[in-house]
From Swiss-Prot:
<dbReference type="GO" id="GO:0000917">
    <property type="term" value="P:division septum assembly"/>
</dbReference>
<keyword id="KW-0132">Cell division</keyword>
<dbReference type="Pfam" id="PF04472">
    <property type="entry name" value="SepF"/>
</dbReference>
<comment type="subunit">
    <text>Homodimer. Interacts with FtsZ.</text>
</comment>
<dbReference type="GO" id="GO:0043093">
    <property type="term" value="P:FtsZ-dependent cytokinesis"/>
</dbReference>
<dbReference type="InterPro" id="IPR007561">
    <property type="entry name" value="Cell_div_SepF/SepF-rel"/>
</dbReference>
<feature type="compositionally biased region" description="Low complexity">
    <location>
        <begin position="25"/>
        <end position="56"/>
    </location>
</feature>
<feature type="compositionally biased region" description="Polar residues">
    <location>
        <begin position="57"/>
        <end position="69"/>
    </location>
</feature>
<keyword id="KW-0963">Cytoplasm</keyword>
<feature type="compositionally biased region" description="Polar residues">
    <location>
        <begin position="86"/>
        <end position="95"/>
    </location>
</feature>
<feature type="region of interest" description="Disordered">
    <location>
        <begin position="21"/>
        <end position="96"/>
    </location>
</feature>
<comment type="function">
    <text>Cell division protein that is part of the divisome complex and is recruited early to the Z-ring. Probably stimulates Z-ring formation, perhaps through the cross-linking of FtsZ protofilaments. Its function overlaps with FtsA.</text>
</comment>
<protein>
    <recommendedName>
        <fullName>Cell division protein SepF</fullName>
    </recommendedName>
</protein>
<comment type="similarity">
    <text>Belongs to the SepF family.</text>
</comment>
<dbReference type="GO" id="GO:0005737">
    <property type="term" value="C:cytoplasm"/>
</dbReference>
<keyword id="KW-0717">Septation</keyword>
<dbReference type="InterPro" id="IPR038594">
    <property type="entry name" value="SepF-like_sf"/>
</dbReference>
Amino acid sequence: MALRDSFNKIISYFDTDEVSEVEEPAVASVKRQQDAAQPASQQQKAQSHQYHQSASRPSQQQVQSGQNRRSGEENIHSLPTRRQSHNQQPAQEKTTIALKLPRKYEDAEEIVDLLIRNECVLIDFQYMLEAQARRCLDFIDGASKVLAGNLQKVGASMYLLTPINVIVDAEEMTLAANGQDVSFNYDMKRR
């Protein structure tokens, strides 16, 4: 029975027939959570005031652990730091756009390597099976979040992956769609 459930879960992961379901009950539950969060936020304010009073006198252990933590954090670059470093670079660099037609999942690593080198990548999944294209797109989207990149859908099976220093004017794409929904979508169904 457990094996059967495992297969059903795997199959349902790839199933896209239920994509158009409306999530109205979720909106109602969010409103209830917001109403319940208002009295809780007043309690949190009182607790945070008490915490700040006790935290104003750090102990010797807290000071030492903070120093150890800072030495380890020197090697870690946060996302805002990466963005600032890209904004400070001179604009004389030329941006290149690579066109990739992945045929297997392993090609996604090559696409991410191009993003690491600050190159734009236009990806067309027309030569991949739908399931492989979804997995590849998941990997690329995750890598773009980590590397502060941007992934936008520009066609039925085409996506544009850009580094942080490239701005894409998506306004023209929405005008060309003539009322069609062009929001980001992982579904690669071809009609």
